């Protein structure tokens, strides 16, 4: 779970793991190549039209679980949506994009730490996270 995002990042519940996740895996396994990409919004629309309960944030958590547990190898995402890639350049670009996002988040973390540590307060303690 991620602090301050508890309801969005909590572990999958039984319904999500046993019912939704297999459906999502089955659907995404047909999305081979960028031209077959499907957006989070579209996946949620399809599932809710079939009376499944899903939110965009919980779908992202399901997809996180699928990736983290190697349930559908090389499932990547772009602004076009999610798809399985067998293209080496796409996979390298996706890994590079993830690294750039990590660096961006770390930069903001360091900026917030610096701002906190530099605030005018005599009784403050410095943050070293």
Mark where each language-model region is.
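Exposed, interaction-prone assembly regions rather than primary DNA-binding/catalytic cores
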Residues: 112-129
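A short, conserved structural fragment
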Residues: 67-77
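Minor-groove-contacting beta-hairpin "wing" of winged helix-turn-helix DNA-binding domains
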Residues: 78-86
């Amino acid at each position: 779970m991620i602090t301050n995002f508890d309801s969005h990042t909590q572990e999958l519940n039984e319904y999500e793991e046993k019912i939704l996740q297999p459906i999502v895996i089955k659907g995404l396994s047909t999305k081979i190549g960028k031209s077959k990409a499907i957006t989070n919004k579209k996946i949620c629309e399809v599932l809710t039209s079939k009376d499944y309960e899903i939110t965009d944030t919980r779908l992202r958590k399901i997809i996180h679980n699928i990736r983290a547990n190697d349930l559908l190898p090389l499932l990547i995402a772009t602004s076009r949506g999610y798809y399985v890639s067998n293209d080496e350049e796409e996979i390298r670009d996706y890994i590079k994009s993830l690294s750039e996002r990590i660096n961006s988040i770390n930069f903001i973390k360091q900026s917030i730490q610096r701002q906190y540590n530099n605030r005018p307060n005599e009784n403050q303690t410095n943050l070293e996270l």
